[in-house]
Amino acid sequence: MTHPVITAARFNEAGLIPAIAQQHDTGEVLMMAWMNAESIAESLSTGQVCYFSRSRGKLWRKGESSGHVQRLVEMRLDCDGDTLLLLVEQTGPACHTGAHNCFFRRVTKDGLEEIA
Amino acid sequence: MTHPVITAARFNEAGLIPAIAQQHDTGEVLMMAWMNAESIAESLSTGQVCYFSRSRGKLWRKGESSGHVQRLVEMRLDCDGDTLLLLVEQTGPACHTGAHNCFFRRVTKDGLEEIA
């Protein structure tokens, strides 16, 4: 049976919806990636976050190779159904660069600077 | 002069980039909307967040009619340049429904439930 969140979600033309991952207990915004109906269903059934990789064109089980998995604590759908918020428990760094989150470039008056 | 964040940003085919708004002092994720080069430049110069409304096809100065403005505290660009994180000071509710943030629908085992 299709979970109601998949019915309510407004996917884009590629069948994808943006998903924001946030560390559930600290509020740290970790990353934003994309999900399709299949990856939402898998995330809900396994409790481990699974995205859809646009570059590889296939499911992306977060941490499958790195071990940097995300346990799904809670999933939320926004008011108009076109964005998901995933409250997660992140193991290790979330970013493929090794940074704890992906938002480590701060915009300054005239440039970008890396923050820890 | 074009700000380096606009040069570094990877806009989609419609010239847009997703932007996550987060209350800077509480970590509450408020909403996700879209920005283009022009709205990024205006946000940086005025210090008030300006998005691009896809449905109306024009700049959307957040709170222009409702007064629910977002003062831009800090802007960050993610590791691969395709998502922005906006740390903001939100005045009033962020969501057009009047909810404080847009993520008020929690996914349950078999449905969606509204949370305060």
Curated annotation (Swiss-Prot), chains A, B:
Cofactors demanded by this protein: Mg(2+); Zn(2+)
Subcellular location: Cytoplasm
Function: Catalyzes the hydrolysis of the adenine ring of phosphoribosyl-AMP.
GO cellular component, one term: cytoplasm
Family membership: Belongs to the PRA-CH family.
Subunit structure, as described in the record: Homodimer.
Pfam families: PRA-CH
Domain of life according to the entry: Bacteria
InterPro entries: PRA-CH, PRib_AMP_CycHydrolase_dom, PRib_AMP_CycHydrolase_sf
Keywords recorded for this protein, A-Z: Amino-acid biosynthesis, Cytoplasm, Histidine biosynthesis, Hydrolase, Magnesium, Metal-binding, Zinc
KW Metal-binding (keyword) present: yes
Cofactor note: Binds 1 Mg(2+) ion per subunit. Binds 1 zinc ion per subunit.
Pathways involved: Amino-acid biosynthesis; L-histidine biosynthesis; L-histidine from 5-phospho-alpha-D-ribose 1-diphosphate: step 3/9
Keyword presence, Magnesium: yes
GO molecular function: magnesium ion binding; phosphoribosyl-AMP cyclohydrolase activity; zinc ion binding
Top EC class, one word: hydrolase
Residues noted as binding Zn(2+) in the record, renumbered to the chain: C79, C95, C102
UniProt: Mg(2+) binding residues: D78, D80, D82
Protein name: Phosphoribosyl-AMP cyclohydrolase
EC number: 3.5.4.19
NCBIfam families: PRK00051.1 (NF000768)
Catalysed reactions listed for this entry: 1-(5-phospho-beta-D-ribosyl)-5'-AMP + H2O = 1-(5-phospho-beta-D-ribosyl)-5-[(5-phospho-beta-D-ribosylamino)methylideneamino]imidazole-4-carboxamide
GO annotation, biological process: L-histidine biosynthetic process
